[in-house]
């Protein structure tokens, strides 16, 4: 540490002591803030806050103000009860919930936390990157999540993802599905720029849909876990969400190359190949949730909205200051 000139030896000693105290105090404050942030980020569900006991159609969201999972309840103050675990992304189905939780510090690291219906921790997996997408199959047996490895937005050209699949029946974890054999345009595709994200599962816990990006284009892929294979079905489909009857896919479609609202929410009929936009006119960047066979829920502008899947009607706000919608249904 350089010592100022023009001061007496005694004054110079006091200046050094004061500087050390200030540095030490700053380090202590940083440590306390980091510890406090870690405790908040790692907060578990309150006793009695579970997915059981709620009506099957009850909506759960991530409450932005607290960072915790909340049950939407019009009779509660603020319209919700935020007593769940702290998560950056949350999804639940069957007897399982999945909480993606970012850890404080640099470089970015996170946890994938598997929970039961009482929101008690079953398994915790440390991950590099930033939480992006989370999905649980309808049975609760198979889970998938996507992390940003570099970058923090799908709108950027310089992003990379890692998508994992966990089978709770066997405990087997695929840390990154990028090595799955991919058929694109009728041929086996090999490229170093392959990225997958936005996995959604069919009812058989084997077939899945996802987005693959390669060569500057995005494609909808249909995957087979048992045969460990994937094939591209069509271009310009991101974050697919399969309808409860397995006949349609809600997805975000790029409609603009600009950074402002580049995606719109669409629905694809798998049998006919026809697609149509829903009545949401604003751009979205989310993996939509089917709340029933006719309705979609999704995050937009810091709130959770719903809209009919057939293109009729108009968007309706479900929860302000919220994201990551999911249902309590088994």
Features from the language model and the residues they span:
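Sequence signature of WD/YWTD-type beta-propeller architectures
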Residues: 2-330
């Amino acid at each position: 540490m350089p010592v100022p000139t023009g001061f007496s030896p005694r004054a110079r000693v006091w200046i050094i002591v004061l500087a050390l105290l200030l540095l030490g105090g700053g380090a202590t404050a940083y440590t306390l803030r980091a510890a406090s942030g870690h405790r908040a980020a790692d907060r578990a569900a309150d006793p009695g806050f579970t997915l059981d006991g709620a009506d099957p159609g009850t909506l759960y969201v991530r409450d932005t103000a607290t960072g915790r999972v909340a049950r939407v309840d019009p009779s509660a103050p603020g319209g919700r009860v935020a007593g769940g675990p702290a998560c950056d992304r949350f999804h639940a189905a069957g007897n399982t919930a999945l909480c993606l939780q970012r850890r404080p510090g640099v470089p970015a690291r996170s946890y994938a936390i598997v929970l039961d219906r009482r929101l008690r921790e079953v398994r915790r997996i440390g991950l590099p990157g930033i939480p992006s997408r989370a999905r649980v199959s309808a049975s609760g047996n198979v889970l998938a999540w996507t992390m940003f490895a570099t970058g923090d937005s799908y709108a950027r050209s310089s992003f990379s993802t890692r998508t994992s699949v966990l089978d709770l029946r066997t405990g087997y974890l695929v840390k990154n599905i990028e090595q799955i054999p991919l058929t694109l345009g009728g041929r086996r595709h090999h490229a170093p720029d392959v990225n997958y994200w936005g996995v959604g599962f069919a009812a058989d816990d084997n077939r899945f849909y996802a987005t693959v990006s390669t060569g500057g284009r995005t494609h909808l892929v249909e995957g087979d876990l048992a045969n460990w294979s994937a094939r591209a079905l069509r271009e310009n489909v991101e974050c697919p969400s399969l309808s409860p009857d397995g006949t349609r896919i809600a997805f975000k479609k790029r409609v603009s190359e600009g950074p402002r609202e580049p995606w719109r929410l669409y629905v694809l009929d798998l049998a006919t190949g026809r697609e149509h936009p829903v009545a949401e006119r604003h751009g979205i960047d989310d993996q939509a949730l089917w709340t029933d066979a006719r309705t979609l829920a999704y995050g937009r502008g810091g709130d959770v909205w719903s809209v009919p899947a057939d293109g009729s009607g108009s968007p309706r706000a479900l929860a302000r200051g919220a994201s990551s919608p999911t249902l309590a249904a088994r």
